[in-house]
Amino acid sequence: MTELLHLENYSFTYPQQRRPALSHVTLTVPEGAFMVLCGPSGCGKSTLLRQLKTVLAPHGLREGEITFCGTPLSQIPGRRQAAEIGFVQQSPENQVVTDKVWHELAFGLESLGFDTPTIRRRVAEMASFFGIQDWFYKNVTELSGGQKQLLSLASVMVMQPRVLILDEPTSQLDPIAASDFLQTLGRINRELGTTVLLTEHRLEEALPLATHAAVMDG
């Protein structure tokens, strides 16, 4: 497998903190992998994931290097990161930015300046893949928690990212919705070939989907 993301001897310390949140982390995420990042609460999993997209990275002291497709992440323009590095957060309320389902799906592509025919085609493809045609014209406020998180996922996938990063995406979902969401991630990896990097407390459901696992010991 080709190396997609790589951290080499990477450390991060929050401002006004002595102890680093991440200490000398080396990690390789191969292209096409489904990787589950494991470790106890507070070990730095969320902090690590946020280092992988510059716009989400917290302020602090960084040492070591992160590369994406062999290029230092710091040298990759924000537009390319927006398109190629997808990120789904714990709460869809923090990610949804428009009032209508269809507009939420189109918003990212509009922001990057894609033409209307391309936007319509990609939105239609993702609506079909995720089975959300029945609520395509609904207000986002009408959706259940599981539907909102699925919409957040579809809104990221419409960008056709090379890697999909998810930080505890089922933490606010009921068990059935959580199971369905994780199975959808498996489909994305298998059928679309998208690399997946995931932290998830439901390891008994996430690990059977994984091709790789990494453990942080804090």
Feature map (PLM): residue ranges:
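Conserved ABC ATPase signature
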Residues: 139-143, 147
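Conserved ABC ATPase "signature" region
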Residues: 117-135
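Catalytic Walker B motif of ABC-type/P-loop ATPase nucleotide-binding domains
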Residues: 164-167
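ABC ATPase NBD coupling module
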Residues: 71-86
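Conserved ABC transporter NBD signature motif
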Residues: 61-72
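H-loop/switch region of ABC-family ATPase nucleotide-binding domains
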Residues: 200-201
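Conserved catalytic motifs of ABC-family nucleotide-binding domains
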Residues: 160
